[in-house]
């Protein structure tokens, strides 16, 4: 039914309705964004994956950004030639040449230095400033910086093994950091509440079969199974 959901919504746009038999993930955009965030922290930090996550309204709005800011950020990423990798050290951990070029750290350094000095005529502290940063771009740059730093921090914390109770506590913490309650709409807060409920279920379920420290890959496998469950099996279309 999920593949037909957009067509149903278009046909019944003037009628109050809801579509049942949709998975938790497809019916909760905040949950979907959170799962992408978790998976991204253990990946290569490819620029497209990072920007795709930031472009979700549920995410960018939590960092004080709007659609115009996100378009500008995409432009900055292209101009500073960010491609993949957190840093030179991250590339080394992936058993690749330890080069800072085209990493997120290199791009952020150029953007921040450009905002600070406003010229690209020479290097400062081995960084070539990106000069096309205007004063009114401060909010966009600040939001991007905070978002990337949260990803960087999470990538280190979530790379470790924890028991199920520690995982529940850690994941609840990062749900709050990614989606601060004070900047969320009532609808988003309701979606976030569902995330919290699922994470508490995770602790109980895994405790029943496994009490040793486990990695994020195991947690993601459990979450993927949980969020593909349908919300309702009572029909395809119901009135509200």
Task: State the predicted function of each range.
Residues 1-240:
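Polyanion-engaging groove/track-forming segments
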């Amino acid at each position: 039914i999920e593949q037909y959901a957009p067509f149903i919504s278009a046909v019944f746009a003037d009628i109050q309705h809801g579509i049942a038999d949709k998975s938790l993930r497809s019916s909760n955009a905040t949950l979907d964004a959170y799962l992408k965030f978790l998976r991204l922290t253990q990946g290569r930090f490819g620029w497209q994956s990072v920007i795709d996550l930031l472009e979700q309204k549920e995410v960018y709005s939590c960092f004080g950004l709007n659609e115009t800011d996100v378009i500008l950020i995409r432009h900055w990423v292209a101009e500073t030639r960010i491609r993949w990798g957190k840093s030179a050290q991250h590339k080394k951990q992936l058993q690749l040449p330890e080069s800072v070029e085209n990493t997120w750290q290199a791009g952020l350094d150029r953007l921040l230095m450009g905002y600070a000095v406003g010229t690209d005529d020479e290097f400062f502290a081995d960084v070539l400033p990106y000069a096309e940063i205007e004063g009114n771009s401060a909010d966009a740059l600040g939001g991007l910086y905070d978002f990337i730093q949260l990803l960087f921090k999470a990538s280190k914390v979530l790379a470790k093994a924890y028991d199920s109770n520690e995982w529940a506590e850690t994941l609840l913490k990062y749900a709050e950091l990614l989606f601060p309650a004070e900047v969320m709409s009532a609808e988003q807060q309701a979606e976030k509440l569902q995330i919290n409920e699922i994470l508490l279920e995770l602790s109980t379920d895994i405790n029943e079969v496994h009490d040793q420290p486990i990695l994020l890959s195991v947690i993601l496998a459990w979450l993927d199974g949980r969020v593909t469950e349908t919300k309702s099996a009572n029909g395809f279309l119901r009135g509200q």
